[in-house]
């Protein structure tokens, strides 16, 4: 299996069966991601070097406007799309097997978790995983210690309050918060 074939498989939302070739390839990608994130996280790097390492991690060039404060963790890396003027603060953890799209102007606070996989609820198949993408619209601000769960789309201009657990799609230009996250108010432009 190669990367293209793997991404086509998971981006169709097909279940990853424990022990399958897709599952084994997922583990190969995790090993590569750990090597790159270890280099990223264990020492000081100028912004250009951070962008270079992040580009290597995701397999495509990040824009010169991209900013990241390490440490940063991911167990895949190759299914992340990052727009322009994106900033990711320290301690974030991205589980991107299901796909993460971060559009232009997004700000991501400290210790945010983006999780794109769920395990099977059947205890006899618990090792199986279901990928679902996360899409973060333009100019979204995700507050520190928030968790975004599989399949969530966050509409442009919205704010996710610190500590929120987002389980459902978020409309454009709103503030949501809480566990689970609920509507707080509309943002007037």
Task: Specify the residue positions occupied by each region the protein language model found.
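Flexible, glycine/small-residue-enriched loop-and-beta-strand segment within the central core
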Residues: 72-82, 87-153, 179-189
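Short arginine-rich
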Residues: 116, 168-173
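Extracytoplasmic/periplasmic beta-strand context in beta-sandwich domains
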Residues: 152, 173-174
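Active-site/ligand-binding-proximal alpha/beta "capping" segment
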Residues: 153, 167-168
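Conserved G/P- and acidic residue-centered "switch" motifs that form tight phosphate/ATP-binding loops
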Residues: 160, 178
């Amino acid at each position: 299996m190669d990367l293209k074939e793997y991404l086509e498989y998971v981006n169709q939302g097909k279940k990853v069966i424990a022990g399958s070739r897709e599952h084994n390839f997922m583990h190969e990608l995790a090993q590569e991601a750990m090597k790159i994130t270890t280099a990223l996280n264990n020492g000081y790097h100028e912004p250009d070097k951070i962008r270079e390492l992040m580009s290597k991690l995701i397999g495509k060039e990040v824009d010169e406007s991209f900013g990241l404060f390490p440490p940063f963790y991911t167990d895949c890396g190759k299914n992340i799309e990052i727009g322009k003027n994106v900033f990711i603060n320290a301690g974030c953890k991205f589980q991107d097997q299901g796909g993460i799209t971060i559009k232009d102007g997004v700000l991501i606070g400290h210790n945010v978790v983006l999780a794109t996989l769920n395990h099977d609820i059947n205890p006899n198949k618990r090792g199986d995983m279901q990928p679902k993408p996360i899409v973060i619209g333009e100019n979204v601000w995700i507050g520190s210690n928030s968790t975004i769960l599989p399949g969530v789309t966050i509409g442009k201009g919205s704010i996710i309050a610190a500590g929120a657990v987002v389980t459902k799609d978020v409309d454009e230009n709103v503030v949501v918060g809480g566990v689970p996250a609920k509507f707080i108010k509309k943002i007037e432009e």
